[in-house]
Amino acid sequence: VGFKAGVKDYKLTYYTPDYETKDTDILAAFRVTPQPGVPPEEAGAAVAAESSTGTWTTVWTDGLTSLDRYKGRCYHIEPVAGEETQFIAYVAYPLDLFEEGSVTNMFTSIVGNVFGFKALRALRLEDLRIPTAYTKTFQGPPHGIQVERDKLNKYGRPLLGCTIKPKLGLSAKNYGRAVYECLRGGLDFTKDDENVNSQPFMRWRDRFLFCAEAIYKAQAETGEIKGHYLNATAGTCEDMMKRAVFARELGVPIVMHDYLTGGFTANTTLAHYCRDNGLLLHIHRAMHAVIDRQKNHGMHFRVLAKALRMSGGDHIHAGTVVGKLEGEREITLGFVDLLRDDFIEKDRSRGIYFTQDWVSLPGVLPVASGGIHVWHMPALTEIFGDDSVLQFGGGTLGHPWGNAPGAVANRVALEACVQARNEGRDLAREDNEIIREASKWSPELAAACEIWKEIKFEF
């Protein structure tokens, strides 16, 4: 017959330890936990096969193509220290397997069916190396860090934001009032909560109008450029675009999208619109923990972050290192650099499995948000540096005197930390001292210091 039917060992075809990776290959590092009795080579090869050209049996149509050209290859297997049952499998995928400019297609292949594969107990995608040839097919962030600073005329410090709470239930006018007070007090941005879309108590068009009014009023009074992340996420792409278009007509600087619940296709569409129309795009990562929280299954957030930089977004939530949500410092800083920098060296201590060259794709500002308040300011300034957005929701609106004084307290604390850093002081060592000193000159900050001095989220 010319072809040998039957089930075959994956490792005969897909495990190639002597393969030299090409500059154009997409490389993946998987943490594999095979079922008992499945050898690492077979499991690694199975992952490569199922996420590229393979199927469970030999098919005669294999003869109509060149498998060697199109197959994924497991080219290296390394043990995981302290874990008998796990190992890291490195897989190389030829560039031709993927549609240009489609994060959706990339993920459908690499993290598609293979995650339900019976021979594996669990599978986690730890990192991806995106080759420059593939990166160049993406537009990436609509504007990037430098353009954003120029548009907003804000330099030399992190930007300040605040999520408007209570997240659900306010009327549009009261919502706009809260926005105005925060911006008037000294914040750069306020934010729609990720679950604020267009509900019965507040339809999107009303919210957009009142928020725009708040922005213009605050700008006129402070002489600073202000923004509010208007959440354009919707049930259909058409509705999402309608909201983005209305935001542009109002002349506001920034809109927002929930990229995981909204989906990468919708996100890339919105990002293209934002670049063409001068809107900044703030990205919220609702649902990420469903995908990235388990240590042995799913995918690490650094992969979702890389995917977002390709799909497009100017801000993305990236954990705080200090607040109420999870995140280890070195690992977090690893993917924060992957978002901001142009070239990132492989560094396993920070969870970075591959050297990544973004070939001047614009950078994304990491957003620290979730359970942070004025006492965290020195640590945040030190950890995240200037190119970041620090978001205090409850840490602004929870101020005993109201929203505007809460905003004042945060702005004073931030300016004090930036000044101390510029004078060469050690923020890590003198953190509380810097805040205490500043609070002598700012009753708003003093009140904030008093109310949050005991708060800790430690479990």
From Swiss-Prot:
Intracellular or extracellular location(s): Plastid, Chloroplast
SUPFAM superfamilies for this protein: RuBisCo, C-terminal domain (SSF51649), RuBisCO, large subunit, small (N-terminal) domain (SSF54966)
Record: residues binding Mg(2+): 191, 193-194
Modified residues (N6-carboxylysine): 191
A Pfam family it matches: RuBisCO_large_N
Cofactors: Mg(2+)
CDD domains (UniProt xref): RuBisCO_large_I
Disulfide bond as UniProt keyword: yes
A biological process term (GO) from this entry: reductive pentose-phosphate cycle
First-listed, main subcellular location of the protein, grouped into a coarse class: plastid
Keywords carried by this UniProt record: Calvin cycle, Carbon dioxide fixation, Chloroplast, Disulfide bond, Lyase, Magnesium, Metal-binding, Methylation, Monooxygenase, Oxidoreductase, Photorespiration, Photosynthesis, Plastid
Site-annotated residues for Transition state stabilizer: 324
Catalytic activity, reaction form: 2 (2R)-3-phosphoglycerate + 2 H(+) = D-ribulose 1,5-bisphosphate + CO2 + H2O; D-ribulose 1,5-bisphosphate + O2 = 2-phosphoglycolate + (2R)-3-phosphoglycerate + 2 H(+)
EC code(s) of this entry: 4.1.1.39
Any GO CC annotation of this UniProt entry: chloroplast
PROSITE patterns associated with the record: RUBISCO_LARGE
Enzyme class name: lyase
GO molecular function: magnesium ion binding; monooxygenase activity; ribulose-bisphosphate carboxylase activity
Chain sites annotated for binding substrate: 113, 163, 167, 285, 317, 369
Cofactor: record remark: Binds 1 Mg(2+) ion per subunit.
Note, other: The basic functional RuBisCO is composed of a large chain homodimer in a 'head-to-tail' conformation. In form I RuBisCO this homodimer is arranged in a barrel-like tetramer with the small subunits forming a tetrameric 'cap' on each end of the 'barrel'.
Function text: RuBisCO catalyzes two reactions: the carboxylation of D-ribulose 1,5-bisphosphate, the primary event in carbon dioxide fixation, as well as the oxidative fragmentation of the pentose substrate in the photorespiration process. Both reactions occur simultaneously and in competition at the same active site.
Assigned protein family: Belongs to the RuBisCO large chain family. Type I subfamily.
UniProt name for this protein: Ribulose bisphosphate carboxylase large chain
Species in which this protein is naturally found: Nyssa ogeche (Ogeechee tupelo)
The gene coding this protein: rbcL
